[in-house]
Structure formats: C-alpha cells, structure tokens
Amino acid sequence: MNLASSNTISGAALLAVLAMSTNIVAQQQEQSKQEHTLRYTLRDLGTLPGGTFSQAAGVTGYGLVSGVSTVSDGTQHAALWFEGRTFDIGTPGLGGANSAGFGINMWAEVAGQSESNTTDPNNENFCGYGTGMKCQPFRWQNGKTTRLSLLGGNNGTVSNINNRGDVSGVAETGKRDPACPGAVAVNGTGPQFLDFEAVIWNGGQKAPRELRPLAGDTVGEAYWINDNGLAVGATGLCSNTQLPPFAAGAHAVLWDNYGSPHDLGNLGGTANPAIRGIGNIAFAINNRNHVVGASALAGNANDEAFLWTKETGMVPLGRLDGDTNSAGLAVNNKDEVVGGSINGDILTGDPHPFLWRNGVMAPLSTLLPPDTDLIPLLANAINDDGEIAGFGFQPSSQEIHAFLAIPCGRTNTDKQWCSEDHRGFFGRSDGADRPKTALPESLRRLLQQLGHR
C-alpha cells in the first residue's frame, strides 16, 4: 500500500520536514530517559508511485528514513520517508536510471549511489544493478547533489554518513588485480578486475581519504563511520573480499582517526570465497566505539553476529532458534543491536530480523501485534529511541515494502497493544511461537537481484 502523499522532494519540503522535527527531537530527548516496554508497532512505508519493492536503510533520531524504492518502470530510486510522506530523490543529476539512498544523518544529508550514463569499460557490476554502467557515489542534501570523487578507477559506492557529514564507502583504484573474480563467482561477486579501497569522504569534501588495508591485504571497504571519526568495515584479498550487497572479507577492521587499520579478530573462521557472504566484516560502530558485524565460525561454513568492545573483544550474539547464520547490521548508543538471522544460505535462505538487547536476541516478529500485515524480513538500522528501519513482505500484495518499527512508550499511540496487559518477547511470551514465513520463490529471486545493505 503506497503512502497517501508521494512527490518529488523539493528544498522547501525538506526544510519544512526539518522544522517539524525540532519539537519532535526535544520531546524524544526527554522521553528517551524513560524505560519503555519493549514491544513495537510496525508502519508500512509503502513505495514510490507504481513501485512494488522498497527497503529502508537508515533512520534519524526524529524518524526520517532513507532507502530505495522501485518506480513504475521497474528502476530503483533513492527515497526518503517522513510522517506519511514519500520523497523521490531519483538519480540526482548523475545521468543513470537507478539509484539508492543508504545512510542519513540528523541534518538530512543522504549518502547514496547512482548509475552514471557511461558504460563501465570492464563491464563490472559495482552498483549491483546488472546494467554494466559505472557506479557513482554521492552526498545529497536539500535537493543539492555532490558527486564524490574516486581513486583512479571507474566505480565507487557508499554505506553511511555521520553527523559531521563524513561518508564511508569504497572506491576503485586504477590497479588491475589478477586475483579478482573475472566472472560472476559462486559467492555472487564479480566480474571485478580492479582493486578497491576503503575510503572516507570528509564533510564538505569531494576527494576521498584512503583507508589502507591490514598488512598482507590488498583491498578494503568501509561500512560505517561514527561521530568520533572512527570507521569500520573489512579488508582482504580481491579473491576473498565480497562487495555489497553480500559483503564480507578476510578481516573485520576498525580504522582509527589516523586511518590506521586494527584487526578486530574473528569467531574462529576466515573468509570463504566458495560460500556467499561467509567471512568477517564490521558493519556498524556507535559513538561509544562499540562495533557490530558478522564473523565466520570455525570451519568457514557459517557466520554469526558479534558485538566488539575494546574491553571484551569480539563476543558472539548467537542466532535465532533454527537458523544457521546471523549478522549484526546496526547498533545504537544504548548497545541495542539489529540485524538478520537466516535459515540456510545467506543469499537464498529465509531471513528473520532480530533485536538484541542486554544479552537477549529476540525475533522482531514476536514484538509486534499478531495482526501486523507486513512480515518483517530484515532490520537495517536503529536509532537511539529504538526505532527500527528495514523491509518486509506484504502477503496481501505479494510485495516487499520498507518499514519503520516504533517502540511502545515513546511516540507510539497504539494504546491497546502497548498496554501492560500485552507483553512481547522481553516480557511474557505473547506471540513468541509465531511461525516464520517462507518467501514465495518469485520474491526470493527479486531479493537476490536487488540485494540489500
């Protein structure tokens, strides 16, 4: 179901959104001091007009959501959602047909990628759209697009943006590497011919700052940068480091303020280029410098979500019952972690989003009302108020839609579900045995084609 109002975003519209958010931020800062009942309602964000697929990738402290949606011709557009409205960022002046929005900060700056209108001379698939066009990273705010420079190669992409406007991502160099997969490999990567490096585009700057890989590694990718300027991601060899959407590397890495890499360790395994998505990668870091991600277990057949701190090192978070793989994709400043737990192969298995809090991993579906129309599939982001952004399957339309899950006790007005008589997984086990839902094969193929971050 599309939202009631959908339009191309304008400067005036976004300024109005930001003005409306001022009081919301003040209210939520006061409300965030109070403990809430950990149960949620879920808001289906819908799609852009004519679209059948959308996903949310980031969420601010006042509920502004960034992501991507298909449109009527089947192409993908970077999008924003706020208070019942959908805004089409499109492919902002970059010439291509497809784009996506990933990270978003409190100033409504969006980090994204767009196809250009130029064919990649190596016919690589860096953006993941399968068109063979060059992939261009950008920073966008209030209708203005900043094209981000590369490292001498043809392609780059981004993953996140902090509140200082620093963008984390990856950019190709001009160096050919015979270790790169020259054809589409079993792990879903390729064809890739050039090395790529983790980079940061500092706020207001177009030129990237290279983040060197660990000694012995040749490539890297930066997935998150916090407000302290610390970045996390992965490094490895071009043969065992997988680009998004199923990113993994030989080593999960933290880069300090000087750009020096630090190995975060592993849970017993290393990268496995023979199995999609299996390896080590740090996906996010909060402002306490605590890191979440996924690490290969001994035997290199499965990944498990982890939380890393300087004091504890890498600690496994587990998987949901019956699942074989998991990954922590985001962490807020309260160390609440969201991500995905998967039954089967990372690419083809059934995904189940989770919320991990105080040592307990809960299926997100058990925290929602039983009559929720959208079945959540993956949780990509969480803000400090506990609002969770992701995407789910809508059985009535057979479509996949972005969602925002809102916790009880904050701005949630669902008095019946949020009353003390109904508790979810973290209280009484209301709905805890709700069956997991397998996706139709057609939608599974769509997810494989579009990928996710």
Language model region names:
Residues 2-7, 11, 17-453:
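Residue-level hotspots at or immediately adjacent to binding/recognition sites across diverse folds
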